[in-house]
Amino acid sequence: MTELKNDRYLRALLRQPVDVTPVWMMRQAGRYLPEYKATRAQAGDFMSLCKNAELACEVTLQPLRRYPLDAAILFSDILTVPDAMGLGLYFEAGEGPRFTSPVTCKADVDKLPIPDPEDELGYVMNAVRTIRRELKGEVPLIGFSGSPWTLATYMVEGGSSKAFTVIKKMMYADPQALHALLDKLAKSVTLYLNAQIKAGAQAVMIFDTWGGVLTGRDYQQFSLYYMHKIVDGLLRENDGRRVPVTLFTKGGGQWLEAMAETGCDALGLDWTTDIADARRRVGNKVALQGNMDPSMLYAPPARIEEEVASILAGFGHGEGHVFNLGHGIHQDVPPEHAGVFVEAVHRLSEQYHR
């Protein structure tokens, strides 16, 4: 078993005692850091950065050089899986990700391969191995994937969407086609996450960014059901240590009880959910991650500290809290404010772990 100098993130996910509340930030390797922008310029474009193991490792480590974060997260993108299925991912300036061949019907789904994680997605595994080597056991490495539903939204819509009318049309007019796609994605994501774990990821997270656009019943059928399948198929132990899994549905605060039944170790919360209420509802079943509004990092330092104190008090005493933002850090946040946030979590949380 690889010795970890700082394992408080893994311990908190498993609701074990820690000295202070662990903290990391979604998108902590990103455009708010000038050093990230420099490395990205060196790579040429976003996907070239993802596909170069040394550069992906460099940007993964950049935030850890600045801040005493308790975890590193693999630098990659949720759309690596659909890209490996041959949909032709490209990025349009100001438009975000697009696909040249969106999925329109059951026949399109039938043609999609289930990618081999060590072949078509080998560059991700190389990045995981490189990052693990360079971390030298300082902090754990988080691997991740998008959820089947969230990946399907991009694949069917052909890119980002505001109203999700194309995929909802498929969901209501041709549910069989959508279920076939989600099933294939669940198998692909299970293989992909297990390969990340074998390559060295010490925890994994499933990002269900668009689950919150569904009705409760549709969320159960088209999103949660497939995340549950993935959780059931994941390697839960590797290198002599439990591998915790976190589910995060943005806008999913009303479904926490159902999410906690999947067998995951932790639930990510966005900033619209009250953490005290969330803890009351899930009890000791799962750990909770979150959940400061990322926009709070625009506030003066004293206000950031006040918000950190309020969220810590909301969760209260005891184990099972990983502090994070409620979604990714914004690209124009002053890096010093992120530093205030991280330092405040450690300093102000000590009293809750005595």
Curated annotation (Swiss-Prot):
It is found in: Cytoplasm. Belongs to the uroporphyrinogen decarboxylase family. GO terms for biological process: protoporphyrinogen IX biosynthetic process from glutamate. It is an enzyme of class 4 (lyase). CDD domains: URO-D. Signal peptide: none annotated. The keyword Lyase applies. Pathway: Porphyrin-containing compound metabolism; protoporphyrin-IX biosynthesis; coproporphyrinogen-III from 5-aminolevulinate: step 4/4. Its main location: cytoplasm. Keywords: Cytoplasm, Decarboxylase, Lyase, Porphyrin biosynthesis. Catalyzes the decarboxylation of four acetate groups of uroporphyrinogen-III to yield coproporphyrinogen-III. This is Uroporphyrinogen decarboxylase. The lineage of its organism: Bacteria, Pseudomonadati, Pseudomonadota, Gammaproteobacteria, Enterobacterales.
